[in-house]
UniProtKB/Swiss-Prot annotation:
GO MF annotations in UniProt: DNA binding; DNA-directed RNA polymerase activity; protein dimerization activity
Segments of this protein annotated with the region Alpha N-terminal domain (alpha-NTD): 1-242
Complex and partners: Homodimer. The RNAP catalytic core consists of 2 alpha, 1 beta, 1 beta' and 1 omega subunit. When a sigma factor is associated with the core the holoenzyme is formed, which can initiate transcription.
Keyword set, alphabetical order: DNA-directed RNA polymerase, Nucleotidyltransferase, Transcription, Transferase
The organism of origin for this protein: Malacoplasma penetrans (strain HF-2)
InterPro entries according to UniProt: DNA-dir_RNA_pol_insert, DNA-dir_RNA_pol_RpoA/D/Rpb3, DNA-dir_RpoA, RBP11-like, RNAP_asu_C, RNApol_insert_sf
Recorded catalytic activity of this chain's protein: RNA(n) + a ribonucleoside 5'-triphosphate = RNA(n+1) + diphosphate
Region Alpha C-terminal domain (alpha-CTD), annotated ranges: 258-331
Entry GO terms, CC: cytoplasm; DNA-directed RNA polymerase complex
Protein name: DNA-directed RNA polymerase subunit alpha
Entry's EC annotation: 2.7.7.6
UniProt family annotation: Belongs to the RNA polymerase alpha chain family.
Signal peptide bounds: none
Length: 331
């Protein structure tokens, strides 16, 4: 059986794995696998990544969300809408999902607001218990009149997807605790596009570009990794239960990328599909194959006669697109 290529993953320029936004490039992929991976990862990212969300609030002498609060500019409905934008991270080692299931509302560690100085109330004014962290501390909550003491408790839990206030209300058996909708997903945006890459003269592969933005509770890279893990755990039983020799099954060619790269080295620079100027400059410099090109350092290529900055950048990009590298500079 012909094995599949092992692809590489590149993070976008000037991005890191801890950022809440990232563009991830998967290449080279077998034809058709760009959409297969892109669509499945996108669906899981949008609906199945675990997050943390407000599910109830408690205010002294307030029993429902339509009640007004003296000395507060906003009504309670607007305050709840503002609080739904609160991004909280719960340390699962301190207060994990299993412990949350076993903890009653009376013993739940709550986030507390005790605001008496008047003025603008922000998320930074919320006191958090051990294991809870507020990400968007500049978030606006309400405006409180001077001399008014405003108190509130916030209940936050771990979950997946979306839960309506009615579903949350069924779990609350306490007086004066108001249930709210919960949107647990830390992923704000997912998009992907698939393009072609010519790896050899007769072979064209897919390139998948996956764009992910999160609310900061998890990084974009972590969200992508989690979505892949979820898919893997769902696919694995299909193989293990239907195929006895699962461990002997080899699908990915571990040497495919290397061998493909080696074979592409010997071919003409014509395959790079360079602009006329870049192509002619290389030819005049006696560079006719990719092998001859990758045997040069960046400094040596920059010194090629009549090769401008634009042509230099084009050549470097064409080499990187084939997962090849130039010769290292000697110290």
């Amino acid at each position: 059986m012909e094995k599949f290529l092992r692809y590489n993953i590149q993070i976008g320029k000037d991005q890191n794995k801890d950022a809440d936004y990232g563009v991830f490039v998967f290449k080279p992929l077998e034809r058709g696998f760009g959409h297969t991976l892109g669509n499945s990862l996108r669906r899981v990212l949008l609906s199945n990544i675990i997050g943390h969300s407000l599910f109830a609030i408690k205010i002294p002498n307030v029993s429902h969300e339509f009640q007004s609060i003296k000395g507060v500019k906003e009504d309670l409905t607007q305050i709840i809408l503002n609080l739904k934008r609160l991004v909280v991270k719960i340390d699962q080692e301190i207060f994990g999902e299993e412990e949350q299931k076993e903890t009653s509302l009376e013993k739940w560690p709550t986030l507390k607001i005790d605001f008496s100085k008047g003025g603008v109330l922000k998320a930074s004014d919320i006191e958090t218990p051990v294991g809870f962290e507020i990400i968007n501390k500049d978030m606006y909550i309400a405006t409180i009149e001077s001399g008014v003491k405003f108190k509130m408790e916030l209940f936050v839990k771990t979950g997946r997807g979306f839960t309506t206030f009615s579903e949350n209300k069924e779990l609350i058996n306490a007086i004066n605790v108001i249930a709210v909708d919960s949107n647990f997903s830390p992923v704000l945006k997912v998009g992907y596009k698939v393009s072609d890459i010519k790896t050899t003269k007769n072979e064209i592969n897919d390139v998948l570009e996956l764009e992910v933005a999160t609310n900061g509770a998890v990084s974009a890279a972590e969200a992508v990794a989690m979505s892949a893990k979820i898919l893997l755990e769902h696919y694995k039983p299909i193989v293990t239960e239907l195929f006895d020799n699962y461990n002997d099954l080899r699908i990915i060619n571990e040497e495919a990328t290397v061998s493909s790269s080696k074979s592409s080295l010997a071919i003409s620079i014509d395959e790079l599909e360079l602009s006329v100027r870049s192509y002619n400059c290389l030819k005049r410099a006696g560079i006719h194959t990719i092998t001859q090109l990758t045997d040069k350092t960046k400094g040596e290529i920059e010194k090629i006669r009549n090769l401008g900055k634009k042509s230099f950048k084009e050549i470097i990009k064409k080499i990187q697109d084939r997962n090849l590298k130039l010769k290292e500079e000697q110290n």
